[in-house]
Amino acid sequence: ARARLGVRRFRRKR
């Protein structure tokens, strides 16, 4: 549920 809100800087850093 948080992957769509912070997918821009969350998937790139983690």
Swiss-Prot record:
Protein name (database record): Unknown protein 1
Organism: Pseudotsuga menziesii
